[in-house]
Amino acid sequence: MTSVALFKQDGSQNGTVELNDSVFSVEANESAEFDAILRQRASLRQGTHAVKNRSAVRGGGKKPWRQKGTGRARQGSIRAPQFRGGGIVFGPTPRSYNYALPRKVRQLAIKSALSQKVANDKFVVVDGLNFDAPKTKEFAGVMNNLKVSERVLVVVTDEDKNAQLSARNLPKTTVVTPAGVNILNVVDAQKIIITQSALSQVEEVLA
């Protein structure tokens, strides 16, 4: 099994921790990562675009001129699509851009991305992130102790409320629980910091 260093909050090493090879030693799969990112970005689209068709445009209830005898083409409404100010034909309507992607593909994408972080030494495991109260300054101190200055993804458990509150106001820092780990935030992060308890939960879900 792959092993990485285990750190304390003060930046000192506290032994090593073994990683599950079925999660953190997976061969890079760019195809799965691409599909998963595409699907997640599509699901984030609001899809609230809309235009007015001829029934939604104000006015146009009266026939503009009589059917016959004027020499002009017959018309039934000045809000028909051929008129300036008329309704739009086949315009965009509100819809969801989300689509299904097999769960195994989504999990493979995350495992592939996590494995690359481990292989590139961008994966830091700490024995815990314990704070007596939410303090952004204290969390920033932990980042300095761990020599982390780049864009970082912090993974903590649901019980680590003070850590979540302490980190969420820091720039270039994203805080999630194991259930919130997804392909976008893993790929976007330049480094991942994860607590030992959160690591166990991630392995339990993905293994």
From Swiss-Prot:
Spell out the disulfide connections.
none
Start-end of Basic residues biased regions: 60-71
Could you list this entry's UniProt keywords, alphabetically sorted: Ribonucleoprotein, Ribosomal protein, RNA-binding, rRNA-binding
Per its UniProt record, what InterPro entries does this chain match?
Ribosomal_uL4, Ribosomal_uL4-like, Ribosomal_uL4_dom_sf
Q: What's in the GO CC field?
A: ribonucleoprotein complex; ribosome
- GO MF assignments: rRNA binding; structural constituent of ribosome
Q: Where is this region: Disordered?
A: 52-75
- Pfam families linked: Ribosomal_L4
Q: Which GO terms describe its biological process?
A: translation
Q: Can you state the subunit structure given in the record? A: Part of the 50S ribosomal subunit.
Which family does the record assign? Belongs to the universal ribosomal protein uL4 family.
Q: What does this protein do?
A: One of the primary rRNA binding proteins, this protein initially binds near the 5'-end of the 23S rRNA. It is important during the early stages of 50S assembly. It makes multiple contacts with different domains of the 23S rRNA in the assembled 50S subunit and ribosome. Forms part of the polypeptide exit tunnel.
Q: What is this protein called?
A: Large ribosomal subunit protein uL4
Q: Which organism is it from?
A: Limosilactobacillus fermentum (strain NBRC 3956 / LMG 18251) (Lactobacillus fermentum)
Whichever gene encodes this chain, its name is rplD
